[in-house]
From Swiss-Prot:
Reaction equations catalysed: a 2'-deoxyribonucleoside 5'-diphosphate + ATP = a 2'-deoxyribonucleoside 5'-triphosphate + ADP; a ribonucleoside 5'-diphosphate + ATP = a ribonucleoside 5'-triphosphate + ADP
Gene field: ndkA
Keyword Iron assigned: no
Gene3D superfamilies (UniProt xref): Nucleoside diphosphate kinase-like domain
Quaternary structure (record): Homohexamer.
UniProtKB keywords: ATP-binding, Cytoplasm, Kinase, Magnesium, Metal-binding, Nucleotide metabolism, Nucleotide-binding, Transferase
Enzyme class: transferase
Summary of the function given for this chain in its UniProt record: Major role in the synthesis of nucleoside triphosphates other than ATP. The ATP gamma phosphate is transferred to the NDP beta phosphate via a ping-pong mechanism, using a phosphorylated active-site intermediate.
Source organism phylogeny: Bacteria, Bacillati, Actinomycetota, Actinomycetes, Mycobacteriales
Subcellular location: Cytoplasm
Name of the protein in question: Nucleoside diphosphate kinase
Coiled coil spans: none
Length: 136
């Protein structure tokens, strides 16, 4: 089943010049980049994107991090795109949960600075795409 998902390459991925590597892995998986933009994230967009984490102890530092530098936002399409992107990304904790061969397993060292975000469900993907790409 063809799906759409949101992928973010976070500020640490931009700073470490991993955009090409990450996009290449997505494309080699057979997925399509339907839209792509480099942007600065406002506090408002960050709060909306991470709304489910509001009130948690790490919420403030999460917003500070995602707004600390440019982000690449992409709409990725393809068969089972949501699961495929999450498999490529690897576990949220790059040391304990991300397998070698995944983006996080190969390149990340900390849970917060884990390089990429991928929507976790069809509902999340729809909501997140509407936030980052209004009208898409």
């Amino acid at each position: 089943m063809t799906e759409r998902t949101l992928v973010l390459i976070k500020p640490d991925g931009i700073e470490r010049q991993l955009i090409g590597e990450i996009i290449s892995r997505i494309e080699r998986k057979g997925l399509t980049i339907a839209a792509l933009q480099l942007r600065t994230v406002s506090a408002e967009l960050a709060s909306q994107h991470y709304a489910e984490h509001e009130g948690k102890p790490f919420f403030g530092s999460l917003l500070e991090f995602i707004t600390s530098g440019p982000v690449v936002a992409a709409i990725v399409e393809g068969t089972r795109a949501i699961a495929a992107v999450r498999q490529l990304a690897g576990g949220t904790d790059p040391v304990q949960a991300a397998a070698p061969g995944t983006i996080r397993g190969d390149f990340a060292l900390e849970t917060q600075f884990n390089l990429v975000h991928g929507s976790d469900s069809a509902e999340s993907a729809q909501r997140e795409i509407a936030l980052w790409f209004p009208g898409a």
